[in-house]
Amino acid sequence: MCRVMKASFSRKVKLELCLLSDCALLSSSSAPTNELSGTNLEAHINESPDPNALVGVIIERSPSDSTQTNEFKGATKETLTIETPHSSECKGAGLLSPVSKSMLERLSKFEVEDAENVASYDTKIKKIVRSIVSSFAFGIFGVFLVLLDVTLLLADLIFNDSKLYIPLVYRSISLAIALFFLMDVLLRVFVEGRQHYFSDLLNVLDTAIIVTPLLVDVVYIFFDIKFLRNIPRWIHLVRLLRLIILIRIFHLIHQKRELEKLMRRLVSENKRRYTRDGFDLDLTYVTERIIAMSFPSSGRQSFYRNPIEEVVRFLDKKHPNHYRVYNLCSERAYDPKYFHNRVSRIMIDDHNVPTLHEMVVFTKEVNEWMAQDPANIVAIHCKGGKGRTGTMICAFLIASEIFLTAEESLYYFGERRTDKTNSSKFQGVETPSQNRYVGYFAQVKHLYNWNLPPRRILFIKRFIIYSIRGVGTGGVCDLKVRIVMEKKVVFSSTSLGNCSILHDIETDRVLIDVFSGPPLYDDVKVQFFSSNLPKYYDNCPFFFWFNTSFIQSNRHILHSFRLVFT
């Protein structure tokens, strides 16, 4: 497993490795203003960074190189360094929960609503009971008992010749199963409240199906019914009463529905869900008019993700004719007719970033939609509803001036998307590059008046990677680098003669000198590959994004992670 360890920059031995990347670039224009805070160097991880671990970008000037002319407007050769400093160099880099008064007011308002939403779970005992009846194991056990009960009933009906007599062993097992489901109903009534639980007609029918066979089992076990054999007209009536137990097949269907809910909660982890008015969706009101949610699915995926029919029902009921949906997934889609053709799609790869141009277009489009009617809202989703979704939502929070800084918007989104009553795991914007691009957008809004910054052309000269033990010693076949721009690979170290790789044992670093690298501009993605490192997202150990317009003084220091291999 490869994990990103935050707020720690000290070098480790054995399996704990500090990464430090150093890129040397050629510049063809002057540098813009400093880059806003945001986490940086990218690795693909399964865990989201804690908002308090967000760090800044430090810019330093490197020694100048000799001047060279090139085909791009006579750009002069300068050196840009991307690196990760040690702990002594990172003081004050961490983000310390930038909670402003306005943010506290917003969070407090939602906390009151959420408290009302879970008012029936406010006691410690209810929380414990809720965790039990909502657990996956409890649901699976219930399905198993229903199957067992139906199997025993069918076996009894097929192999028992008696019209009336029912074996005591079967009745005892049936009674035990019925008591379990009665206990299940009572616990759910205790947790959810009687009025709320029985407001669902299916719950009422399910309770009746449980209670009726339970009463029959009690009569058969504890009362003498032999006298009924002398009354022929009772035989068929009792036989029909036994067949009522077959209705428990419906209970199995009901249990399947509960199991689906459990699976969806298991997949969504501790993301804040909407559980009012008969809905249970991985969906969060970030503000009154901005919704973050996971992918609306159909078919088999709807078993563990938001069913698209339920999402449509929710939006049509809560915001009829006043919602617009944004699909940020490049890897999956659905028919826009589900949402009355009010769907916009932005193609962003999983765990990657939108382009700066896409962020500007998106925020302006949403702003126009919001301005058309005070009732208009947007529902934004990717696959899980936090990384790509959070990046775009945070950009709009800045564009609409709900928050002024990247740190505030990122922290706020994380607080809203995370349900801390279930777990403290952070469910905000995932990757360092996504955090960084929110910082870029803050500059676009405040320094460039919501317009793209001037294009800056750069050339890669060198990569330096520090302290990756066992990597780089095998030459070109061991460590590779790839550069992607405009969704095209513009450089790959696998091509012969376009770079040299040297492992400096004394300084414990790998030097990758690039010969005749391509001109880079706007949004650039850098991927690293090695046979000695595990592959994760994008089929590589780690990668990062940056925008050339925000590189200052040609030294771009990326904080801050250690890769820990276990």
Swiss-Prot record:
Protein's name according to its UniProt entry: Phosphatidylinositol 3,4,5-trisphosphate 3-phosphatase TPTE2
CDD domains linked: PTP_VSP_TPTE
Taxonomic superkingdom: Eukaryota
GO molecular-function terms, A-Z: monoatomic ion channel activity; phosphatidylinositol-3,4,5-trisphosphate 3-phosphatase activity
GO biological process: lipid metabolic process
Ranges for domain C2 tensin-type: 455-566
Transmembrane spans: 135-155, 173-193, 208-228, 234-254
Chief subcellular location: endoplasmic reticulum
EC number: 3.1.3.67
Catalytic activity: a 1,2-diacyl-sn-glycero-3-phospho-(1D-myo-inositol-3,4,5-trisphosphate) + H2O = a 1,2-diacyl-sn-glycero-3-phospho-(1D-myo-inositol-4,5-bisphosphate) + phosphate
Coiled-coil stretches noted in the UniProt entry, renumbered to this chain: none
SUPFAM superfamilies given in the database record: (Phosphotyrosine protein) phosphatases II, C2 domain (Calcium/lipid-binding domain, CaLB), Voltage-gated potassium channels
Functional description taken from the UniProt entry: Acts as a lipid phosphatase, removing the phosphate in the D3 position of the inositol ring from phosphatidylinositol 3,4,5-trisphosphate.
Keyword set, alphabetical order: Endoplasmic reticulum, Golgi apparatus, Hydrolase, Lipid metabolism, Membrane, Transmembrane, Transmembrane helix
Gene Ontology cellular-component annotations: cytosol; endoplasmic reticulum membrane; Golgi membrane
Topology with respect to the bilayer: Multi-pass membrane protein
Annotated localization: Endoplasmic reticulum membrane; Golgi apparatus membrane
Uppermost EC category: hydrolase
Keyword Transmembrane helix: yes
